[in-house]
């Protein structure tokens, strides 16, 4: 029973403490139980302030919208100029017929699409042909290497044989030249004997000098060579 009484009294105590705390706050000025009524001056001054804010907001929004509109117009103008330039370049790149004097944008784009498809098809054919040519080139190169293998070995063998023969021939010719040089070497006494003998023979046979024979010319040349 006492416990039930304590449960019933507890909310009442909490409510009393709450009311007491609110009274103290009102006394110190932290809060008021009733809101204060606004003065007539404030009531009349608030609506004009709200109107001025609305006017400022409306004027600011109008300026912003005007700036946005001008920016949009400028961007649209630039976009149309760029599109016109691209269409002019497209007319130059696409082969157009002589009877086509005026083109619409849609017709020009369709012709460009068809022309691009033709170019892609031609590129595929060219690539396929190039691959076939490269394959044929590799086959011919391997075939040429196979054919040149025995011929190259034969040529190298013949070159080696020819070089050996030429070296032997040059050695024999060098020996013959040395033998000829050794056979033509004379002493000073032999040269003097030959010169005196040839001079006496020429004096004894002076009549032969008048004849324009080969022996006369040879003897004269021998005389000139020894006298010099």
Curated annotation (Swiss-Prot):
Swiss-Prot/TrEMBL keywords: DNA-binding, Nucleus, Repressor, Transcription, Transcription regulation
Listed InterPro entries: bHLH_dom, HLH_DNA-bd_sf
Residue spans of biased composition, Basic residues class: 43-56
Biased composition (Acidic residues): 173-183
Key word Magnesium present: no
Subcellular location: Nucleus
Coiled-coil features, chain-numbered ranges: none
Main location: nucleus
Gene Ontology CC terms: nucleus; RNA polymerase II transcription regulator complex
Cited function: Transcriptional repressor. MXI1 binds with MAX to form a sequence-specific DNA-binding protein complex which recognizes the core sequence 5'-CAC[GA]TG-3'. MXI1 thus antagonizes MYC transcriptional activity by competing for MAX.
Oligomer and partners: Efficient DNA binding requires dimerization with another bHLH protein. Binds DNA as a heterodimer with MAX. Interacts with SMC3. Interacts with RNF17.
PANTHER family assigned: MAX DIMERIZATION, MAD, MAX-INTERACTING PROTEIN 1
Annotated protein name in UniProt: Max-interacting protein 1
